[in-house]
């Protein structure tokens, strides 16, 4: 009897609780109402004063906004879409190392740095090949800038002997390029008074009379140099001649270019060398995701963001996407280019 009474009371209490409970919610509806976090993809860019950082910020913005708006209709889209987050870095070499360590999924890097790292050759000689690297696209050409004060007396690369020169930071692609250039001219770091700082700090040191020149590889125009040319007496040094001929014959991923008159206020046409800037991705990133990122990269939405966001953005064109790529394409990117008839 006691058991029956206890059971009766519990039944009564349960009935009262249910009577006062809020209406039942369909489980599927409840899950649908909850916000779904986007998949985060990290993009390594560059340092302050260069081109990688602003271009990387624009690409991250474009891929994220495009994916968020189109994800609902894509059957292979992860719930919540994709958020591409740009991160500053020391440059190409550091970006490749970050990809190898799994710290980022996407990275901007110079084509020669990508090639050397993937094969374990050149400046990556003696290191294990970076087999996790895959390519999405070549974006634009980067020019080697040799910047000096107009009154420095530096008119050519050999004039750098015994001068105070910044070669950019360790981890940058610029440092490797400058070492190759100096070697072509019969010089090395020991022949200079080298420093290793980014262009914004190099410019400040040059204004203070503590530095004679600095190198930077970046897409022209660079905002830090536009500002310097307007307010400081700076100029660019031509990089040309037989030494450059031998450099290009030995390392064909370099090419000749000219930084046009007017790119920087008061600076005339300046011959120099260039290398491709590429967007890389880890090999283990999902094929469908990389396909959608590649498709978004060449969308009208991204086109508008790049054209408005940076002077170099207008030079990022789909017809040049495969120029100079010497490491394997990611299967997701390859699928997109095959659909476009760019690969057979």
Language model feature labels by segment:
Residues 197, 201, 218-236, 252-253, ...:
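An extracytoplasmic/periplasmic, membrane-proximal ligand-sensing/linker region
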Residues 10-23:
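Bacterial N-terminal signal peptides
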Residues 70-77, 82-90, 189-199, 216:
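Short beta-strand-to-loop elements that line the ligand-binding cleft
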Residues 40-72, 141-208, 303, 323, ...:
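Bilobed "Venus flytrap"/periplasmic-binding protein-like clamshell domains
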Residues 1-12:
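Bacterial N-terminal signal peptides that target proteins for export
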Residues 126-139, 262-271:
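A structural signal for short loop-to-beta-strand junctions that line the ligand-binding cleft
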Residues 27-43, 77, 154-164, 331, ...:
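Immediate post-signal peptide segment of exported/extracytoplasmic ligand-binding proteins
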Residues 111-113, 121-122, 152, 188-280, ...:
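Pocket-lining segment of extracytoplasmic ligand-binding domains
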């Amino acid at each position: 009897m006691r058991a029956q009474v206890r059971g009766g009371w519990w039944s009564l209490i349960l009935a009262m609780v249910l009577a006062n409970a809020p209406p039942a919610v369909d489980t599927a509806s409840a899950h649908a109402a909850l916000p779904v976090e986007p998949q985060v993809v990290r993009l390594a860019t560059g340092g302050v004063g260069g081109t990688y950082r602003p271009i990387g910020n624009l690409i991250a913005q474009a891929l994220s906004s495009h994916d968020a708006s189109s994800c609902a209709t894509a059957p292979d889209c992860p719930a919540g879409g994709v958020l591409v987050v740009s991160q500053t870095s020391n440059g190409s070499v550091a970006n490749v190392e970050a990809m190898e360590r799994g710290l980022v999924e996407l990275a901007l890097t110079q084509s020669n740095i990508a090639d050397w790292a993937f094969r374990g050759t050149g400046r990556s000689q003696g290191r294990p090949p970076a087999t996790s690297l895959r390519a999405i696209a070549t974006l634009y050409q980067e020019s080697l800038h040799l910047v000096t004060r107009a009154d420095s007396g530096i008119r050519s690369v050999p004039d750098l002997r015994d001068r105070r020169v910044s070669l950019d930071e360790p981890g940058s692609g610029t440092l490797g390029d400058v070492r190759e250039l100096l070697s072509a001219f019969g010089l090395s770091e020991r022949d200079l008074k080298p420093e290793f700082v980014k262009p914004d700090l190099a410019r400040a040191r040059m204004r203070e009379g503590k530095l004679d020149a600095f190198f930077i590889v970046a897409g022209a125009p660079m905002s830090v140099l536009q500002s310097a040319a307007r307010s400081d007496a700076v100029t660019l040094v031509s990089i040309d001649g037989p030494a450059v001929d031998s450099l290009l014959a030995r390392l064909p991923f370099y090419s000749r270019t000219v930084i046009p008159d007017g790119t920087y206020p008061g600076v005339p046409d300046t011959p120099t060398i260039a290398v491709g800037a590429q967007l890389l991705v880890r090999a283990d990133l999902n094929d469908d995701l990389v396909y959608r990122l590649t498709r978004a990269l060449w969308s009208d939405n991204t086109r508008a963001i790049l054209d408005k966001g940076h002077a170099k953005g207008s030079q990022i064109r789909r017809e040049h996407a495969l120029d100079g790529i010497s490491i394997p394409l990611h299967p997701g990117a390859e699928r997109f280019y095959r659909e476009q008839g760019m690969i057979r």
